[in-house]
Regions:
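Conserved beta-strand segments of alpha/beta enzyme cores
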Residues: 14, 62-64, 83, 96, ...
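Active-site environment of divalent metal-dependent phosphoester hydrolases
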Residues: 22-26, 47-53, 69-75, 105-109, ...
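Binuclear metal-dependent phosphoesterase catalytic core
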Residues: 2-12, 18, 27-29, 76, ...
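A short, gly/pro- and small-residue-rich
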Residues: 59-70, 158-161
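Active-site neighborhood of phospho(di)ester-bond hydrolases with catalytic His/Asp-centered motifs
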Residues: 17-19, 40-46, 64-69, 85, ...
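Conserved catalytic scaffold of divalent metal-dependent phosphoesterases
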Residues: 17-25, 71-156, 202
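Short, structured coil segments at secondary-structure junctions
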Residues: 58-60, 80, 192-193
Length: 208
C-alpha cells in the first residue's frame, strides 16, 4: 500500500514501513524487483530478524528498527545490517526519526514498559530534542493511548505517546502492534493536530 502524504517540508523520500507479520504480497514484490525505489526501510517490531535482513539485503537500503513485545530472539540474534533506533533521535538525510520500542507492561515479558518508564525514556532524550530542534517521524511498536489501540491490557497504547505528539508535533507517528485488515490506505491514518498517526501492520510505502 503506497501513501503520498502532505508535509510542510517535503523530504523527497520513499519509505517502506513494516510491522508484525510478513506480508506475502510485499515479499513477492521484493523478490520480483517491482517494488520501485525505496530510500529507507523502517520496522515497527514483531518481525523475525531474518526477514528484516532479507528486506535490507534485497532492496539494498538502510533499515531502522524498534523491537516489539514478541521480539524475544533479538537478544541473541539482531537483524544483520540493520540499526536499532530505540531511545534515539537519528537523522536520515533530512529526516529526523525517533525510535521507541515495546508495548505497555502486561505480564513482565521482554520489551514491556509502564507508562512512567516510557515517559522517563522520552524525558532522557531532552538534549537530542534541543540539539535537533525538530522530530519529523516517531517510530514505535505500540500506538498512543486511545488512538488505534484496544482496551485489553496487552494492546493499550501509551499516554506518554499522546504527550509526545502534543509537545513535539511530529509529521508522522508510525506504529504496529494492532492487527487489523485494512481495505484502503486511508483506513490506517488518524490525524492528531498536525501529526499523521499510521498503523503500518503488514506494510505501507510512504512518500514523504
Amino acid at each position: 500500500m503506497a501513501m503520498k502524504t502532505q508535509l510542510t517540508t517535503p523530504h523527497n523520500l520513499r519509505v517502506l514501513t513494516v510491522s508484525d507479520y510478513e506480508d506475502n504480497a510485499l515479499t513477492q514484490r521484493v523478490e520480483a524487483k517491482n517494488l520501485g525505489p525505496v530510500d529507507l526501510i523502517v520496522s515497527c517490531g514483531d518481525l523475525a530478524p531474518e526477514y528484516l535482513s532479507f528486506l535490507r539485503d534485497r532492496l539494498d537500503t538502510p533499515l531502522f528498527y524498534v523491537k516489539g513485545n514478541h521480539d524475544i530472539r533479538y537478544t541473541l540474534s539482531n537483524p544483520m545490517g540493520c540499526e536499532n533506533i530505540h531511545a534515539r533521535l537519528v537523522r536520515f538525510k533530512t529526516l529526523h526519526i525517533l525510535g521507541l520500542e515495546g508495548s505497555i507492561w502486561y505480564n513482565g515479558g521482554v520489551n514491556q514498559y509502564t507508562d512512567k518508564e516510557m515517559e522517563k525514556i522520552i524525558f532522557s532524550l531532552w538534549f537530542s530534542f534541543w540539539r535537533k530542534k525538530v522530530v519529523h517521524m516517531v517510530v514505535t511498536h505500540a500506538p498512543p493511548r486511545h488512538i488505534h489501540d484496544a482496551e485489553d491490557r496487552c494492546h493499550m497504547g501509551f499516554e506518554s505517546f499522546v504527550k509526545l505528539i502534543d509537545k513535539r508535533n511530529p509529521d508522522y507517528f508510525i506504529h504496529g502492534h494492532i492487527h487489523k485488515d485494512f481495505k484502503t490506505p486511508a483506513e490506517r491514518i488518524t490525524t492528531v493536530n498536525t501529526t499523521q498517526v499510521i498503523n503500518t501492520c503488514g506494510y505501507t510505502i510512504l512518500e514523504v
